[in-house]
Amino acid sequence: MKRAYGFLVAVSLLSGPTVFAQDLSRYRDFVLESSVDTVAAASGVRATEAQTLHARPAKIQELQWRAPYVNPAITTADPVRDVAFTFFNDALYQVVVTYSRDRTEGLTNNDIIESLSASYGAPVPRSAIARTDLAADVLLENTVLAQWNNAASSITLLRDTYSPEFQLIVSSKPLTARARTAIREAIRLDALDAPRREAEQRKQDVADTEAARDKVRSTNKTAFRP
């Protein structure tokens, strides 16, 4: 119950403006550049649940929050289905919010944009949307509906290309740039290291097989009676 409470106490973006109006570095109680421990405490998720996606050259971690089941008949339930928090060296650089289809059913794109504008101000003109702030796979699978931008942060509202699902991405521009560079380098290093790791794994598999065979032999030899 603690996990649900920790997230639901925050004011819903779809139910009106927050006291942190037009602060693009914040989503509800979560502030960009916060630590894993800080985000975990605010969400009710244990910090130990954070997964390390890459350990070098920088530590990239992800912490997931998922909404508990709520009776669909409760119309005041939180519209958020899940949230993914991503960290660069223990600093929150991206928040990806996915809204429940049940809670956004019937809402138009403009309905969502108007609600977010109450918190973040007017979005930038469509011609000024910075698509480079978004990963290529995100742009491939989603339509950008609106964006809020300043020098340090960006907030982008997306809709799935193939389904009526809305997402909100809140990101730190400088940390996102550093994280992307680190992730590319991590992938490169992993590829270089793959042959060695595969050889070590094969060696370990052989050793494990031999150890298991020796254990069975020892057990059966002791118990065997002609």
Language model feature labels by segment:
Residues 17-21:
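Sec/Tat signal peptide C-region and signal peptidase I cleavage site
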Residues 60-107:
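Mid-chain, structured segments of secreted extracytoplasmic proteins
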Residues 22-57, 99-226:
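Non-cytosolic coordination micro-motifs
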Residues 6-16:
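Bacterial N-terminal signal peptides
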Residues 12, 76, 86-88, 137-139, ...:
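Sterically constrained small-residue positions within well-ordered secondary structures
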Residues 1-4:
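Positively charged n-region of N-terminal signal peptides that target proteins for export
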Residues 6, 22-24, 84:
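Short, functionally important structural connectors and interaction interfaces within domains
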